[in-house]
Amino acid sequence: RSTLFPYTTLFRSYDFDTSVDRSGTYSLKWEEAGDALPMWVADMEFQTAPQIRAALQQRLDHGIFGYSIVPPAWNQAYVDWWHRRHNLDIDPESLVFSTGVVPAISSMVRKLTTANENVLIQTPVYNIFFNSIINNGCRVLESPLKYDGSGHYSINWADLESKLADPQTTLMILCNPHNPVGRIWDRDTLARIGELCWNHHVTVISDEIHCDLTDPGYDYVPFASVNEQCAMNSVTCMAPTKTFNIAGLNTAAVMIPNPVLRHKVWRALNTDEVAEPNAFAMTATLAAFNESEPWLEELRAYLAGNKAEARAMINEYNAAAAPERRIALIESHATYLLWVDCSKLTHDTALLCEHLKRNHQVMFSEGAEYGGNGHDFIRINVACPRSIMQEGFNRLFAGLHDFSAE
């Protein structure tokens, strides 16, 4: 069977088809999977851009790995990237370095709230948000997204407003674009969220780490770009790590236009000791944003091809499967993570994922981790060579065929 990919690049400069052996590299993704094919945690099976590898090699060859500063060139790299790619003009002074988006979020939950206050999240959503809230003495307040049963999520505005209006709710963590459902929030939606949070005195943390991994032809809207209210009442978390597959290098930024809020966040990150770069963080960030854009464009096209192939394979499977064993792929235009509805088969995908890993040697993320109606879903990472993705889906289909929820 051949598939025509809508975003196939006929003459690629970069290789995304060759499998790279990650054994011996202490990879979380592979070590946790054991003998299973790992299609769970969100890192990619591609070497990072050669421009980044060359810069890191040069830094490595220097041989001295002492303490690092954050140079003005780091701020400027973010400013130039967001202006060029996302039409957002960032004040360099509004950027603060952090060792990661998650450490920054956890630190801000501690500093911007008092104990037992509510932090609102829109579920199903990135599971580590729950950890950042609970581990820092606050309460998770879920405003579940509405699911129409046929592949589309939307915001329950009445529920969102009632929960933001609770005086105990002081912080909202927004996922933009949204992981795991892959939704790119449009400007009107973000404006309405911003207005509600402003009216009810709720600060917004916008996690925008997936912003550069949109399908070709689709652009995300930075929360801070929507209007002055959104800008002055928010902290935006941004990083090159998801985009360029360098999560292990621990480099990120928070962008805070409001100087009063910025000082609080700066104090939080420094108090928690997550504001100093390691010896490779600056080198990797500068090479990513200043030199690696062509690699990213080819990556996005390749990922879009993978997603198109995944949809074609699911359609082919469904055409031959019994109705009670069919699955549905959620429509999405961001991230390399697919959110797959398995509710016809089971309402406990933890059991399904266990079966798939044990009996068919493929590992996905069980949806219940993400809250909301996630128990009906699995999350599949397709950032891998197409042949590996195809093998993973064939194992999935075999597992769906012989799964029993009893």
Positions of predicted regions on the chain:
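N-terminal small-domain helix-loop-helix segment of the aminotransferase-like
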Residues: 8, 12-100, 107, 288-291, ...
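PLP-dependent enzyme catalytic core of the Aspartate aminotransferase-like
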Residues: 230, 346, 354-364, 370-406
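Conserved core of the PLP fold type I
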Residues: 65-195, 212-213, 220-225, 229, ...
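Single conserved hydrophobic/aromatic residue that forms the stacking wall/gate
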Residues: 1-9
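Helix C-cap/helix->beta junction micro-motif
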Residues: 136, 199-200, 230, 360
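Conserved glycine-rich beta-strand-loop-beta hairpin in the small C-terminal domain of fold type I
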Residues: 286, 302-311, 329-342, 374
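Conserved core segment of the aminotransferase class I/II
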Residues: 54, 228-304, 400
